[in-house]
Amino acid sequence: MHSIDASVERNPNQILLLGRNDPVKGHDFAFQIMNELERRGSNMTLHCTGREEVPEGSSNIVAHGWVSKEEKVKLLQESSLLLLPSAYEGQPMVALEALACGTPVLASNALHSLPDVIFRPGEETLESWVDLIEHIRGRKLVFGDSLTQHSVESINERLLSLYQGLIEPES
């Protein structure tokens, strides 16, 4: 898991979408969000990974393609918000990585197993996502112990305990 690097300056106008180029990841919905933000006069920019190209005429979207782990961490630390508009995910590690970097996360209501510090749009409408982005923008969050139960170590410990209980039942 990553930690916050105080030397990296966060850009209050930078939103991030990390994920492969797959319809389930919600790139197209994120592009709609950016179009609406631009229509409202916002100067926010979406940086997205997993895609080489952006829709024609999109001046507020930057495609990074596939990025290294180091580039991913830098993007997480520079961004003011991570979007997770995915239709479904198992345990979305990218959300936990973002939170570990101090980056707020706005995730689809369809995603479960996330800490309670994740922002949710309420209704899954374009307007509710855009309204919440404008509300969250540039907020500094304090997570406290909320992430501990979702850390890799904690999940591994719980799985190990579960498997040991199955293999070695109590007498």
Residue positions per predicted region:
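Nucleotide-activated donor-binding/catalytic signature segment of Leloir-type glycosyltransferases, i.e.
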Residues: 50-73
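Aromatic "clamp/platform" in nucleotide-sugar-dependent glycosyltransferases that forms part
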Residues: 87
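Conserved donor-binding/catalytic core segment of Leloir-type glycosyltransferases
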Residues: 7-25, 31-34
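Short alpha-helical donor nucleotide-sugar binding micro-motif in glycosyltransferases
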Residues: 74-79
